[in-house]
Amino acid sequence: MKNSIPIDLIIEIVSRSTAKSVARCHCVSKQWRAIFRRKYFIELFLTRSKARPRILFVVQDGEWSEWSFLSLPQPQNSSLVVESADIHMKKFSAGISGSIYFTYASGLIYFKCMRIPKEDEDEKPVLCDPLTGKYVILPEPRVFGMYSYLGFDPVDKEFKVLFMASGYTASKDVDHYILTLRTGELKWRTIQCPFTHEPLWTRICINGVLYYSAMNSDGNYVIVCFDVRYEKFKLVDTKCRSEFNGLINYKGKLCGVKLKYAYRVGFPVKLRMRVLEDVEKDEWSTYVKVKVKQNLSVAGMTATGDIVLFMKFASNPFYVFYFNPERNSLEVQSVEIQGLGANPDRIACNAFVDYVEDLSVNDAMLQLNSIPLQQD
């Protein structure tokens, strides 16, 4: 009589593996496939994944704007060197190029314009899973628009694309569009915005609310709040004279970050944060000085409370920097990533913190009949 491994032990072992390993387990038997698609296992796997977060880099390669997706373990201490062997990489195959304008939400990336020669010579909106390298070509709205954003509703587990029609100004007098990414026909629906504004590209989705920077009709900088589930807009005044350099998730709240560079003395950075406590109230934090001689961007705040800055352009070596604003720390913890900056044709980088493997995201892409990328 054969000794079998208890199913509870199998679940425990597989829940600590990778999404790729789970996918292989689906092929073992129908029973295993059913077990690993249960809600209980998907939530258990996500809990385990959150204990090993990664940093996701979206790297623009060459003058034709080809894209690579790289992720690496999110360092938990200073002076750490991340070897190239720890980097997971997916890349669009040769000839695929896209706009620099893209948005990220809950593990997926939405490109407003992407050209995939084997599919179509024209540029199309594309949804991509950087973990698996799969993508979905989305239908195009029948109207012109400069700005569109990806959001995620954590209650109904749905991704939606918000498309603001017309040119640089989103008028309250025209129809805008929204696309829900679910099984079946992908179809744009009209939606109205109660106020006229000029959208900007600084954006983030936090707990089912999509936030993006904008200017109102008076020329003041504002934040547009879009409830992804209920599809409602709200306007929040930033009381700032310039746009935020980045929007980050500050313990579940929106935080606008401003970086001030003193160019004459070698790029020391002054960082200022403004936290939105609710839609009616916000407050400024104190200045934090960061002594770094680099041209940096803000990736976000980790679950441990560290703000992550990264080098805007690829170099060799490539560094990310950590500091904790609550301690008002003046010392930057630097992490060297070997291999990321080795390609001289890489133009620009974007980064996202606390990137975790989520099986529900993989299922969403499967339901949309996603297509695998070719990996270089």
From Swiss-Prot:
Domain F-box: 1-44
CDD domains: F-box_AtFBW1-like
Domain of life: Eukaryota
Cross-referenced InterPro entries: F-box-assoc_dom_typ3, F-box-assoc_interact_dom, F-box-like_dom_sf, F-box_dom
PANTHER family the UniProt entry points to: BNAA05G37150D PROTEIN-RELATED, F-BOX ONLY PROTEIN 12
Name by which UniProt lists this protein: Putative F-box protein At1g30930
